[in-house]
């Protein structure tokens, strides 16, 4: 009861003031970001290069494998590029794939997050060593690869690329987590060091910190979000001097199938929240969904939100969906534009 009341207090105190639009109200649907014939497409993480081109690192796998378990068994991370944020995006090369060997990342390189630190590009991803486990399995881990070029080659951090696994301390909140650690969100702290956010037990968001880019990453013993219903797929950034974490809202803290923008003063305690994005229908209208084809999931919603920041401000949102709203035979990722007004 105490936990439920504290969550309710957070949500009631953190809705935008009267007359102030939520983060979710600023998004405008543009269209498809990546559609690849013969492939399902999922998490699509953007980065801007020095020439103004936008690169997307995209989880994809052959269409003959269903979304689940295809993402666990056959996902790879492909690199696409466009002259601007709205595309069209062109395939360049496969950046990472499962090793196929007896390693922690034998299968399913998935849900990338791309960043730049100094003169190096940092590609975070998840993978597993046995796709026959149940959905959202305990053998998920987080890896890191680095390169001085967005076209690679990519060198795995440390001995084998793995930078985070579930804790071995039984007092930690996600000890023996049924879903491992997954879906990384990365932030270079303005005072030095690095923050690695992740989803784990109970659909809560956790945090691991490191002094050096390649680690070691040390997990905090408590979750950083206060939620009694699952969230996931965080994207971390700093805006107006505050730490922000954009996640999905799986079961309706605000609206089931929408998103949440969490806010924190220190990046550790996310005690304020507001709607981060809405269901797809809110941006395209019901009529545009009449030909939508379901490939995964229940609601027609966005998944794995990833932001493109320009001059430190969110400008574009890239997100896949279990539904192809245009009726195609595989999933695609979509792009939305942020309107400041």
List PLM regions with ranges.
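Positively charged n-region of N-terminal signal peptides that target proteins for export
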Residues: 1-4
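Carbohydrate-active catalytic/glycan-binding domains of CAZyme proteins
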Residues: 18-341
């Amino acid at each position: 009861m105490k936990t439920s009341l504290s969550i309710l207090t957070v949500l009631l105190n953190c809705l935008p003031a009267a007359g102030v639009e939520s983060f979710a109200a600023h998004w405008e649907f543009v269209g498809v970001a990546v559609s690849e014939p013969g492939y399902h497409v999922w998490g699509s993480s953007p980065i801007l290069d020095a020439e103004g081109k936008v690169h997307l690192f995209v989880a994809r796998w052959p269409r003959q494998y269903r979304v689940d378990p295809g993402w666990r068994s056959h996902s790879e991370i492909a690199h696409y590029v466009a002259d601007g944020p709205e595309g069209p995006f062109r395939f360049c090369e496969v950046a990472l794939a499962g090793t196929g060997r007896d390693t922690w990342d034998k299968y399913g390189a998935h849900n990338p997050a791309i960043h730049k630190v100094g003169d190096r590009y940092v590609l975070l991803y998840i993978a597993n060593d046995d796709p026959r486990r149940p959905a959202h399995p305990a053998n998920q881990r987080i890896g890191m690869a680095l390169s001085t070029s967005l076209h690679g080659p990519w060198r795995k951090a440390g001995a084998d690329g793995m930078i985070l696994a579930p804790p071995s301390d039984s007092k930690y909140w996600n000890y023996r987590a049924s879903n491992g650690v997954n879906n990384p969100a990365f932030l270079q702290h303005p005072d030095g060091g690095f923050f690695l956010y992740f989803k784990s037990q109970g659909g809560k968001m956790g945090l691991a910190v490191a002094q050096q880019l390649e680690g070691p990453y040390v997990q905090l013993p408590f979750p950083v979000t206060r939620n009694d219903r699952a969230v996931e797929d965080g994207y971390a950034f700093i805006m107006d001097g505050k730490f922000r974490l954009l996640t999905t809202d799986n079961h309706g803290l605000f609206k089931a199938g929408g998103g949440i923008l969490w806010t924190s003063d220190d990046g550790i305690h996310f005690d304020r929240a507001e709607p981060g994005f809405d269901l797809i229908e809110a941006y395209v209208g019901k009529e545009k969904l009449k030909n939508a084809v379901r490939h995964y999931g229940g609601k027609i919603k966005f998944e794995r939100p990833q932001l493109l920041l320009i001059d430190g401000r969110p400008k574009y949102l890239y997100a896949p969906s279990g539904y192809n709203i245009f009726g195609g035979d595989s999933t695609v990722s979509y792009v939305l534009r942020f309107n400041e007004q």
